[in-house]
């Protein structure tokens, strides 16, 4: 496949992916507004759900903003996977309410986030360690970087959820802390069904799912890298070449 053909294929796939994501997002917004107009939830819940729609758009834009700022290009499959994950987590989970309709939706996403963010870590790891001699040492170093990168992203996501719940505790329940609340006592303390707190259980189970997903993905990848180091190129980032302006012909050349 020629470079131009590859570029055309990439362009078509991205256009289709953007179109599908946009249709799902628009449908989710329309679905949310209709539910609000039917009186299924209050205005605060409408604002909360629409906020996640904005966040979904921002996350998709961030993928290509990173590529633009650092003059890199992620593998096409990774770009599409990141967009799909953003739509599934933020749009599907919140606008369409799949967190409530599908009991395991949250844990499924946290488990799948392990392999997804591991691939991002592998891409950055192969770039950072590109000058390291090939061999078992490099394969282990790249895999370790990807492992820590994935866990770090999972940790930061939990920090984000906690921050949102803390700043706006009335309408947000990202860490399911409201699920275990029975009532409030006269002394100001809360009466809960779970001594450890439902929020703590949700946070730790999310981190464990991310850990398990990361480990299950990276162990076979490490074995593959050790046997065939060239396979690391599957996750390699591409350097975007600067566009060079064509030199204007001199008067003599014009003649």
What are these model-predicted stretches?
Residues 60-63, 85-90, 150-157, 161:
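Alpha-helical transmembrane segments of multi-pass membrane proteins
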Residues 7-11, 41-45, 64-77, 132-137:
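Membrane-interface helix-boundary motifs at transmembrane edges
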Residues 5-23:
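N-terminal membrane topogenic signal
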